[in-house]
Amino acid sequence: PLVYEYVLDYLIGGFETYGFDKVITYIADNINLDETCVNSERKADLEKKVESLKKFAVGKKVPDFSTTDLNGDKITLSEIKSQYTLLVFWATWCPHCTNLIPELQEIYFPESSDKLEIVAVSLDESEDDLRGFLNEGRYPWINICDFKKWKGQIVQQFDVYATPTMYLLFNDKTILAKPMTFSELKNELF
């Protein structure tokens, strides 16, 4: 059973890393943890991971949230009326993120936010670091941060475990795609 648990955890982690959503969905739909795991703590961790995979699968509606953005404006995800919404979890201390965020300027036009709106949820703890990074570029989309890193309400609500994490949403806030890279995002949009 210990080897089974390790292999299952390893495979799920690997499939998540490479964006094999269909394989992950298949595992989540067909695994019966009651028959396989002995260690109750490990079983609880795997059950949580499997439930999260099911909850955030392509085609599922994401949970709604309301918060205040960095400009002090109230934001409610369900009230964003664009055709697509990109929800991106990132941080200034993540090198992949600091490469991705500037690339998003290529696809975002404030005057066309009815087509695509970006909601960037930062996991930063330092307001100075975040504002310093944002002030270096042109990032006119919705920027959110509660400065609680992995313990932030929205971060926990979405079971974020890595940065960057992206969800491309339809206007009804169902998941269209979970791109891993900017090129995958562009392929979904264009």
Where are these regions (language model features)?
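Oxidative protein folding and maturation machinery
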Residues: 1-73
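Structural microenvironment flanking redox-active thiols in thiol-disulfide oxidoreductases
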Residues: 99-137, 150-155
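Thiol/disulfide oxidoreductase modules built on the thioredoxin-like
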Residues: 139, 148-189
